[in-house]
């Protein structure tokens, strides 16, 4: 395979003197928004070992002097971070601070603001990434004596345009509420946790993307003084600010010190979960605090190590990346003590200052930047991390792990649950572990393959359909889009997620090792560790599932039947004859973001089948999308309560329309009907390949953009070197080559499963068709025989044709499949149910608002036969 090997030093290469500027500069666009990654920087994005290090700022100290020599750089190694003197005449207008968690960034910011605010009229805008962080900053500022800072929560008007908002702390999603009188005149702009703040541009809750993007860009271009700080501030950010303000006006501070609570922390990745320890503890059910430890608690397991510390009287904090595991581990801990605090998205928010009252605190990513617990109360920290497509990314996990600043024993034990990662062979890891590489031990074949995969990933990001639509009005969004795709798509692979988290912890001055591998980590040992945790997670999955059952609430059906919001929901989305119990089951599934997304997509698919011209008119599809994907829908939360949740439609509908144009055609070919349970006909792998083939590459690109699934190309997977590397890094036994039809079947399964919640199931039918073979008509039998080139010239009657078909039964013995709709799919209004007398009055009213020219035309008149 003719692929150049890229070493872990690739991204440090200097830009040659006189080299051409990044694409976009020549056209008058200093941001290069048309191509967020310039060709001259391409090699930075194709080194599988150093890619994560570069994206999280680990190379800034080497990169800045080489690429922007006129930018000043200051490395601070021996104490908490400090900012440049605000009053110094040589101070530059833009200061970027990259320093680890626990390096005193916020304390230094408060000290700097105290010096910079030399007049009552000095105005300051602080932009944060979360509501909780906004409130925390306001409290810190008030306690430190910084006067007159207010939050956007205190505004009684939607637009804030004058005092007291001249010193304002605002979440980035509400930036459009700051009026022009203020926005154009701020003296100081502070972006605390700047990478997380920019990351919010990709959140489904960002409803004013174009306006927020433009306002942020204006502030970055014109504000006299800017402070941008983050533990993961990277070269992309510095390059962006240099392009806006000039490299001579940018100063970079790199803090290399972290307080002992982090630098002395020892992180250990555990190989096993230990569900047998969990089950044994729950069976004992002794009095709180009195659960006896086993004779020899198994070491190297999450629950075994946790039990040993709880039984020994230690105080423990536990991070869980999923709500369900947080509930399970809380039940386990309550066998040892009553003093357990559980914090997640479904529990009331807790005050971090009260954590010292508890022996065990369990939390999810709801506890993140801005919330910190400083007292030396906890002995150890445990972390359960489950990478999955709709879960928190590894940066969010890393930030949550830093909320407890001091651990008395200085130990962090991490279990990576690989059961949520994708197991299909079309998902291939593209990152190599940096510790293994530090000894120069990755074979050249590994680096060649993974570097090529990184290059393909970059190309897919550049080809993103969102680029053309977003680049026109959302420059910052387009500039940092690569990092967003990187963090979401790598969640499909356990190895990639583990390597990213490992890199983030290392960059934060922590010592990280893997259980049983204290010596130099070799490629073989790393791959064996991956395989071990992968199979352990699959074994433990069933035991955990049994513990996650919830008590049903029998009164919900009656409550749902009597609630007006539920009635409106049924009228808009569901068949009128749906039973209340079915509605309740559906609303439980809608409690999660992924459940709501798949529900809306399947509703839209049925709508496109009912209104076929939506596939030919963007205006018609946009009306359907606005009708179904906006507003609020009723859900039932984990507490069994009815709750209204707002839908968050995407601002870029173009790729969604393309997806439904393709999928509605496919659905029609498969005789799809949700109410009937799925596809009306079975199909073979060859049929799937034929369905996908006209637009195969577009399907892969749309799954990448809309489902964050980075599917590896079929021809690449056919390479022996790629197969060997993928098998080693996936933690799976060798799986052989992936044929063209197998690749198509995997892609088909991902399209329907990830986007619509539809299962691909093996059919028990031997012969193609929607019904039983005994019910085939004479014509249908003839078509089957002709399709397989079976001579039937001697047969005249149905009986003769049927006998001939059965005589050639083996020729139809190949695997056949069908699509199975989710259980709630039977509740939806479909094109079949639309034939009933009950018309969809609400949808008709929505479509009636479309102008006549939006509908298909024939010789200048509306073609009613196609509607």
Curated annotation (Swiss-Prot):
PROSITE patterns: HELICASE_ATP_BIND_1. The keyword ATP-binding applies. Keywords: ATP-binding, DNA replication, DNA-binding, Host nucleus, Nucleotide-binding. ATP binds at residues 99-106. Belongs to the herpesviridae OriBP family. Residues 1-39 are annotated as: Disordered. Residues 15-28 have a biased composition (Low complexity). It comes from Human herpesvirus 2 (strain HG52). One of its GO terms (molecular function) is ATP binding. GO terms for cellular component: host cell nucleus. SUPFAM superfamilies: P-loop containing nucleoside triphosphate hydrolases. It holds the Pfam family Herpes_ori_bp. This is Replication origin-binding protein.
């Amino acid at each position: 395979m003719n692929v150049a090997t890229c070493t872990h030093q690739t991204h440090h290469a200097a830009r040659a003197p006189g080299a051409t500027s990044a694409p976009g500069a020549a056209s008058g666009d200093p941001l290069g928004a048309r191509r967020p990654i310039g060709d001259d920087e391409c090699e930075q994005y194709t080194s599988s070992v150093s890619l994560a290090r570069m994206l999280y700022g680990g190379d800034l100290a080497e990169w800045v002097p080489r690429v922007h020599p006129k930018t000043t750089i200051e490395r601070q190694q021996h104490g908490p971070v400090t900012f440049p003197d605000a009053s110094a005449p040589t101070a530059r207008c833009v200061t970027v601070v990259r320093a680890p968690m626990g390096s005193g960034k916020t304390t230094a910011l408060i000290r700097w603001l105290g010096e910079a605010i030399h007049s009552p009229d000095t105005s300051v805008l602080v932009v944060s990434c979360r509501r909780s962080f906004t409130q925390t900053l306001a409290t810190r500022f008030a306690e430190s004596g910084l006067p007159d800072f207010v939050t956007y929560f205190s505004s009684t008007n939607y637009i804030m345009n004058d005092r007291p908002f001249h010193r304002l702390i605002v979440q980035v999603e509400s930036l459009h509420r700051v009026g022009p009188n203020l926005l154009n005149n701020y003296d100081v702009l502070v972006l605390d946790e700047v990478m997380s703040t920019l990351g919010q541009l990709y959140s489904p809750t960002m409803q004013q993307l174009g306006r927020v993007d433009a306002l942020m860009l204006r502030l970055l271009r014109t504000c006299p003084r800017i402070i941008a700080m983050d533990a993961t501030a990277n070269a992309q950010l510095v390059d962006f600010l240099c392009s806006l303000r000039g490299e001579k006006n940018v100063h970079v501070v790199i803090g290399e010190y972290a307080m002992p609570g982090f630098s002395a922390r020892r992180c250990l990745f555990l190989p096993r979960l230990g569900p047998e320890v969990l089950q044994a503890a729950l069976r004992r059910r002794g009095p709180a605090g009195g659960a006896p430890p086993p004779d020899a608690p198994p070491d190297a397991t999450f629950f075994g190590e946790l039990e040993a510390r709880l039984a020994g009287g230690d105080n423990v904090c536990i991070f869980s990346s999923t709500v369900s595991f947080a509930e399970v581990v809380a039940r386990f801990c309550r066998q040892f003590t009553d003093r357990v605090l559980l914090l997640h998205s479904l529990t009331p928010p807790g005050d971090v200052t009260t954590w010292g009252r508890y022996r065990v605190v369990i939390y999810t990513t709801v506890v993140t930047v801005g919330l910190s617990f400083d007292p030396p109360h906890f002995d150890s920290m445990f972390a359960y991390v489950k990478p999955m497509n709709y879960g928190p990314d590894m940066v969010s996990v890393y930030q949550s792990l830093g909320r407890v600043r001091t651990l008395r024993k200085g130990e962090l034990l991490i279990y990576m649950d690989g059961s949520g990662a994708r197991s299909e062979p079309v998902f291939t890891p593209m990152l190599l572990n940096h510790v293994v590489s530090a000894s120069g031990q990755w074979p050249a074949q590994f680096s060649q393959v993974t570097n090529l995969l990184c290059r393909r990933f970059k190309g897919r990001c550049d080809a993103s359909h969102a680029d053309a639509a977003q680049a026109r009005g959302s420059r910052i969004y387009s500039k940092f889009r690569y990092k967003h795709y990187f963090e979401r798509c790598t969640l499909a692979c356990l190895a990639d997620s583990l390597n990213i988290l490992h890199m983030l912890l290392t960059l934060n001055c922590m010592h990280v090792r893997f259980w049983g591998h204290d010596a130099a980590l070799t490629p073989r040992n790393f791959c064996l560790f991956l395989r071990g945790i992968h199979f352990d997670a699959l074994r433990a999955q069933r035991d955990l599932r049994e513990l996650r059952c919830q008590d049903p609430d029998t009164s919900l059906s009656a409550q749902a039947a009597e609630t007006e919001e539920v009635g409106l929901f049924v009228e808009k989305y569901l068949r009128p004859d749906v039973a209340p119990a079915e509605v309740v089951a559906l609303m439980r599934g809608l409690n999660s973001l992924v459940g709501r997304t798949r529900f809306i997509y399947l509703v839209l698919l049925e709508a496109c089948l009912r209104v076929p011209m939506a596939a030919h008119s963007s205006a018609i599809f946009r009306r359907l999308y606005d009708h179904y994907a906006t507003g609020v829908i009723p859900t039932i939360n984990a507490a069994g309560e009815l709750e209204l949740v707002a839908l968050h439609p995407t601002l870029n509908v173009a790729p969604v329309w393309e997806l439904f144009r393709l999928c509605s055609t496919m659905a029609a070919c498969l005789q799809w009907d949700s109410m009937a349970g799925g596809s009306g006909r079975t199909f073979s792998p060859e049929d799937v390949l034929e369905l996908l083939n006209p637009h195969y590459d577009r399907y892969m690109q749309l799954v990448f953009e809309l489902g964050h699934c980075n599917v590896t190309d079929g021809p690449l997977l056919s390479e022996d070197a790629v197969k060997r590397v993928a098998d080693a890094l996936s933690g799976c036994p060798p799986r052989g080559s992936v044929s063209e039809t197998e690749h198509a079947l995997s892609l088909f399964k991902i399209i329907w499963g990830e986007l619509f919640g539809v299962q691909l199931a093996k059919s028990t039918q031997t012969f193609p068709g929607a019904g039983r073979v005994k019910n085939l008509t004479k014509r249908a039998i003839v078509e089957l025989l002709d399709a397989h080139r079976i001579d039937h010239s001697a047969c005249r009657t149905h009986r003769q044709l049927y006998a001939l078909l059965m005589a050639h039964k083996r020729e139809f013995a190949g695997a056949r499949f069908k699509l199975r709709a989710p259980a709630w799919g039977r509740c939806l209004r479909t094109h079949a149910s639309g034939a009933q007398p009950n018309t969809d009055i609400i949808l008709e009213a929505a479509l009636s608002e479309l102008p006549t020219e939006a509908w298909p035309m024939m010789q200048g008149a509306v073609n009613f036969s196609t509607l």
